[in-house]
């Protein structure tokens, strides 16, 4: 039995988002192939994702020094650490997001901050940082109005972050071009799902 963690980073629903529509179909197909696997979902728009702000940074520093922190800081720090541990416990990760202004939603960045933890997911070496997260798989699904073929900053950001952490098994599927040619929207979606089906054969 494997643990699958889905990170949902879109505030709309599947009727209004090609990315979430693809996620729904992915979940159905994945569950039929791996009925024993455990699936957890983090919705970065609905769940509590602590922002890496001044109170949280101060709480992190105080905790390392063994100093007291406020109940509010303890709650935020506890949630932050829980998200890190949830990520580490997962065998497979699915990240689903739109491309907004050539970037990912800021809420997704906040979640990504929780998985970049020195000493847990990477360490500092004499020649640079070393990723500590090995043997996990990533599937990144992103919807784009235009066609970027993975060269947009958001896609590159996701890929580089997970490579930095040590991931080697990375797949990216882009549902893109619907705004450029709305008449081809269904064809574009079906082509993306065909790619996802192919990935599922070994995912």
Curated annotation (Swiss-Prot):
Enzymatic reactions: 2 a quinone + NADH + H(+) = 2 a 1,4-benzosemiquinone + NAD(+); N,N-dimethyl-1,4-phenylenediamine + anthranilate + 2 NAD(+) = 2-(4-dimethylaminophenyl)diazenylbenzoate + 2 NADH + 2 H(+)
Amino-acid positions noted as binding FMN in the UniProt annotation, renumbered to this chain: 143-146
Positions in coiled-coil regions: none
Lipid metabolism listed as a keyword: no
Membership in a protein family: Belongs to the azoreductase type 1 family.
Subunit structure: Homodimer.
Name of the protein described by the UniProt record: FMN-dependent NADH:quinone oxidoreductase
Gene expressing this chain: azoR
